[in-house]
Every structure is written in C-alpha cells, then in structure tokens.
Amino acid sequence: MGVNVLASTVSGAIERLGLTYEEVGDIVDASPRSVARWTAGQVVPQRLNKQRLIELAYVADALAEVLPRDQANVWMFSPNRLLEHRKPADLVRDGEYQRVLALIDAMAEGVFV
C-alpha cells in the first residue's frame, strides 16, 4: 500500500469516526504528530502501526454503515458488556478488531447490543 493510499485510508477512518489524531494515536500506539504525518502522506508507518491503521479503517467502514459519525465515536470509546466491558477502540489496539466487527455485524442485522 503506497503512502498516498494509506494516507487516504487513515484520513477516511478519522473522518468516518470523528477521531482526533490523539485518539488514533492511542489506538495504534503512536504520537498524534505521527498520525498527522501519516494522514499528510509524509511518511509510512512501521509495520505494526500500518496493520492497526488498516484494521481501524476496516472497522470504521463497517461502523459507518450502522451508526452516524457522532454515535460511532462515542461507541468506539465506551465500555461494552458484549465485549467483557472493554472498549471497541481498545480491542482494535490489541489486534482483536474481528471481535469488534462481529459486534458491528450483529448491530447491522438488528440484534440489540
């Protein structure tokens, strides 16, 4: 994935979830300055950061289909009983984005969560 494609992917996730650079940095374990440089296409993140950013963008795409931006942001940072009271953002940070996607899929199917 090229610098500009990744920058667009990161920027899209930030926009869809209404995230700040600090929030993205918390999710991918990076400084807000690094996130700003990634979104500007100035640098390419290291492998693990890149992987987490791609996973975050994937989650953002799915969540944008079921919740408006302001609700999606709150949902990402709120403890959830169906995730053992963990925050979806924390699961993405820990590489467990598939659990978050499963919950989003359940929401899309009309399962009350």
Swiss-Prot record:
> InterPro entries from the entry?
Xre/MbcA/ParS-like_toxin-bd (IPR024467)
* Record bears the keyword Membrane: no
Q: How does it assemble?
A: Heterotetramer with 2 subunits each of MbcT and MbcA; the tetramers further assemble into trimers with 3-fold symmetry.
Q: What happens when the gene is disrupted?
A: Essential, it cannot be deleted. Deletion of the mbcT-mbcA operon has no visible phenotype.
Family classification: Belongs to the MbcA/ParS/Xre antitoxin family.
Use in biotechnology or industry: Molecules that disrupt the MbcT-MbcA complex could be candidates for anti-tuberculosis therapy.
Q: What induces it?
A: Induced by hypoxia. Expression probably induced in both active and resting C57BL/6 mouse macrophages. Induced in persister cells. Induced by Ethambutol, Isoniazid and streptomycin treatment and by starvation, repressed by rifampicin treatment. Probably part of the mbcT-mbcA operon.
Q: What is this protein called?
A: Mycobacterial cidal antitoxin MbcA
Going by the UniProt record, its keywords in alphabetical order are: Toxin-antitoxin system
Function text? Antitoxin component of a type II toxin-antitoxin (TA) system. Neutralizes the activity of cognate toxin MbcT by blocking access to the toxin active site.
- State the organism of origin: Mycobacterium tuberculosis (strain ATCC 25618 / H37Rv)
